[in-house]
Amino acid sequence: AKADPEDILIAIHVSNRGPETARLDLLPTVWFRNTWSWDGGTERPRLAVAGGHPAAIAISESTYGDRWLHCEGRPTLMFTENETNAARLFGVTSGPRYSKDAFHRYLIDGEHDAVNPEQIGTKAAARYQLSVPPGRTVTVRLRLNDKRPGLGALAEKDFDGLIAARRREADEFYQTILPRSLSDDAARVARQALAGVLWSKQYYHYVVSDWLWGDPAQPSPPDDRRRGRNHQWTHLYNADVVSMPDKWEYPWYAAWDLAFHCVPLALVDPEFAKEQLVLLLREWYMHPNGQLPAYEWALDDVNPPVHAWAALRVYKIEEKRRGIGDRAFLERVFQKLLLNFTWWVNRKDAEGMNVFQGGFLGLDNIGVFDRSAPLPAGGHLEQSDGTSWMAMYSLNMLAIATELARENPAYEDVASKFWEHFLNIAHAMSGGRLHGGEGHDLWDEGDGFFYDVLHAPDGTRTPLRVRSLVGLIPLLAVQTLEPEALEQMEGFSRRMRWFVEHRPDLTGNVACMRTPGHRERRLLAILDPDRLRRVLRVMLDEQEFLSPYGIRAISAIHRDHPYRLNVNGTEYRVTYEPAESSTGLFGGNSNWRGPVWFPINYLLIEALQRFHHYHGDGFTVECPTGSGQMMTLGQVAT
């Protein structure tokens, strides 16, 4: 909690839930980010025992001035350097005398000479040796501020009173954020989730040119690094506070993770959410060709294009809460996403036929092969999810253009562009089925499901019949057009009517273009009512995708019936794996072969709601499949 912008109060509560007294060492730690080891020109900051105050750490840095960490009681203060233990890691004799692993070595290995006896360094900890009785809680208080040590810094009454006041203020704030319909338990879960995403902000510093050529004060990297990964991203200069998937296990941004983060962030900090979405589109992130950086390990990889969706959701959330939307933000994002959309069309459509690839697309090991690597037999994958993401992207851009056209008619032309893109993609996914089209049908009529298709060098095409989210993502490409918007956009409406009349080969592959639905809405979707029912029959089957906790990433039928494919004498296999991954793909700690992934479930809920907005209460499906219980799509979504 903060007393003021320069005064941070820290209370650490240690609870013993067991039946016996427990002893432990608690080490609140303060350190400087290492900025001095790389270019040789940066002054080293300093931590030391505050003179005359053995329970306070003096913090000195040339740019930011002096601070102090006040520690309750009489802990043992330990100091070392925030530098790598080169001897242990690289087996060299040179390196710092005191290294960042010193506290572990001191406590666990008994190496008392691992810490600096002069009590100075760039990393420090206050060691508390605690004994906590069963069922009791011990509290340790610290305070970080710009005030010299003295009496009263940790006075318990004032300290605890201020934290209690900040807690009340936080309670009042979240009462304005969370729906009143939530139970107390659900509200706590929501607050914990929002706290988690706020806590995962991190300063992220990655300069590709520095990484390729090395730091001035360090040994030069091998020459092949300059021809390796990320060598085409020399413009990338990241030095910003960024929302991370997790500051410990995943301390780097991923393009689509960040977009998803921004939607809940918009509830508590809409300005930060907007800044994050704009940041990834700036010139020092986005490639000059329009590609968004995927993540640091391989900036060239491709995440699903959900940036437009997230920007519109953030815009709508702020508009609902404040009564007015930030149109300047929406326009900034839209203008830059035009570049990204064009990159997708030019780079990820191998045959120029509106059937897209994209590689792993964030779904890691969901495929038969590593979809980011060359295929074992050559050729390419026509991806159901890649194509569907682009259909959704087209509709998201159409929705943004429609919103902006309310005040600027110039956006009507751009709305028409994205509407026509969507028509072409929907046409391609169905193989132009109404007019005898061939060659690109990702829909399997027999199974009532969408699959990736392996397109071999000899022209043969093999559907990869894995029941996975790859076949459900076509559901996400859905948008309704309100009659009021169509009336206002006269030019767009004329163009739409012309297409319906003169290009039935295209409009016939889009759900319900000719027929107004509930409240005269128009529907743009890949799935017509028949295909919608067939896909939902699979998705809502408890033996397949529907679990007690959401929609699985892969159908449970693959538990007993793995998918197998033989290519050049090698068998490839996909099995339902609801827990840990059995493959080493993408580090081995990422599993898309069974677990429920919340962001995709969120998008599926949103898609069902949109279908319901068009079809209304007259359209029902069996949920769960085989139960005899009929529900509207709105009921299924909830």
Give the predicted meaning of each segment:
Residues 1-638:
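Acidic, mature catalytic/reactive cores of soluble proteins
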